């Protein structure tokens, strides 16, 4: 298969420059994707009520559980397509493209049905306070009504990135984000629709981004999407699931542990809930950077592993580790120093700001310790091994967090005891990943 410019940019050239050239569009896209919920949070917090802000915040872990598993499933298609593309296997790219898009449509419908039907029940299980429950239930019902568009967009963006195109997904997100802001102002501020308006604005913007990338794939010259070619290839589906199911389970385990933590946060009342919501939005940049490096290394390793450029795989790990740790370290320092100023963007309630500032001071300084987890997990998946990173994360992070919440937090019931479970599990998981990579994956790359 004739390789396009985008592929050459990933499999050839100075590694740190090529990774950054791929990383920045992903980061920008992640930023605008995060802006969906951030704009909702700011407008709901300032123009509706503190209870509405808490209601939107408490739905986060639940939304992530539903979306996480099925998005993880879809990531299997992205990894396989990147390997086919790097190897120059045109038929493999075509088959993965059509199987992946079909899978995203089916999964999107499933998420929509499950989310609308089970979302409110799950919120009750999370001990959502009575003064927030109705608004939170309304938000998740409207949000999950747009699950099909969200799932389709994520698959489309992953496919384009796997082929080295990280720019057009960003363009679609910029347009969608602008649509989201306008619709938030119209529906929440203008029409006074409250949390339902915020959720509906997000759904509309997701539809816009999904349609834009659908048009891009249909018009792609080298590897176009053909509606007549949509369908599931069983053999390819098994390969996708072999990578995607463990990735999805990992995200679910992460989000289940976060849901348990959210349940603990809920037990402290609406003020702490609002503070936690504001903190998570404040800390979003850290995880946007982390996630962008994770996507970049997965795609980079996938293409270079498929092209048998194992030397570049090894070097990319070192480069991404250095850049991610350095970047997140600087962000964490700035966030800790200016935490009250940043929190003031989301709310004017002084008690919420002070509690949020305390949460940041406990968690954020340790964020860089999670970067080895992101980089090594992405590397392993790019090489086609999704089970091992899933097992490491589930045991080192999720299980430990659950045990911590059920023992230490239950016994002492302080905000400090709840917050420390994050840095504690980050450090533990990073150590396990470093040892696993050095003992198992590094020798494999050197052997071939």
Set out the residue ranges of the language-model regions.
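Short alpha-helical transmembrane segments in multi-pass integral membrane proteins
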Residues: 1-23, 81-146, 190-245, 301-366, ...
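Interfacial/gating helices of multi-pass transporter permease domains
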Residues: 44-64, 130-135, 195-196, 236-243, ...
């Amino acid at each position: 298969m004739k390789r396009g410019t985008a592929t050459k940019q990933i499999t050839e050239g100075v590694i740190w420059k090529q990774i950054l050239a791929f990383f920045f569009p992903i980061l920008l896209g992640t930023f605008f994707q995060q802006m969906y919920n951030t704009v909702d949070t700011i407008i709901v917090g300032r123009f509706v009520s503190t209870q509405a802000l808490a209601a939107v915040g408490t739905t986060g872990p639940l939304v992530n559980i539903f979306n996480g598993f099925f998005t993880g499933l879809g990531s299997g298609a992205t990894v396989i397509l990147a390997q086919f593309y790097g190897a120059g296997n045109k038929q493999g790219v075509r088959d993965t493209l059509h199987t992946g898009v079909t899978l995203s449509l089916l999964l999107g419908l499933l998420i929509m049905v499950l989310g609308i039907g089970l979302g409110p029940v799950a919120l009750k299980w999370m001990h959502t306070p009575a003064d927030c429950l109705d608004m939170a239930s309304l938000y998740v019902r409207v949000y999950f009504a747009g699950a099909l568009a969200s799932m389709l967009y994520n698959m489309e963006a992953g496919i384009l990135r796997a082929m080295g195109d990280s720019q057009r997904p960003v363009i679609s997100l910029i347009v969608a984000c602008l649509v989201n802001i306008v619709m938030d102002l119209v529906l929440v501020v203008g029409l006074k629709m409250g949390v339902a308006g915020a959720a509906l604005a997000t759904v509309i913007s997701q539809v816009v981004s999904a349609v834009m990338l659908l048009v891009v794939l249909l018009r792609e010259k080298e590897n176009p999407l053909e509606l007549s070619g949509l369908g599931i290839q069983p053999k390819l589906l098994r390969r996708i699931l072999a990578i995607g199911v463990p990735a999805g389970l990992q995200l679910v385990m992460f989000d289940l542990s976060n849901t348990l933590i959210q349940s603990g946060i809920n037990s402290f009342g609406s003020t702490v809930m609002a503070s936690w919501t504001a903190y998570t939005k404040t800390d979003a940049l850290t995880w946007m950077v982390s996630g962008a490096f994770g996507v970049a290394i997965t795609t980079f390793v996938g293409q270079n592993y498929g092209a048998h450029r194992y030397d570049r795989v090894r070097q990319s790990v070192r480069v991404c580790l250095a850049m991610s740790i350095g970047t997140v370290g600087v962000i964490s320092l700035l966030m800790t120093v200016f935490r009250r100023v940043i929190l003031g963007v989301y709310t004017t309630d002084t008690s919420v700001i002070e509690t949020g500032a305390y949460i940041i001071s406990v968690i954020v300084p340790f964020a860089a310790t999670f970067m080895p987890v992101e980089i090594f997990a992405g590397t392993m998946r790019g090489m086609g091994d999704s089970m091992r990173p899933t097992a490491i994360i589930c045991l080192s992070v999720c299980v430990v967090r659950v045990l911590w919440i059920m023992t230490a937090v239950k016994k002492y019931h302080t905000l400090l005891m709840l917050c420390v479970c994050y840095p504690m599990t980050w450090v533990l998981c990073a150590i396990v990943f470093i040892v696993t990579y050095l003992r198992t994956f590094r020798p494999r790359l050197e052997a071939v």
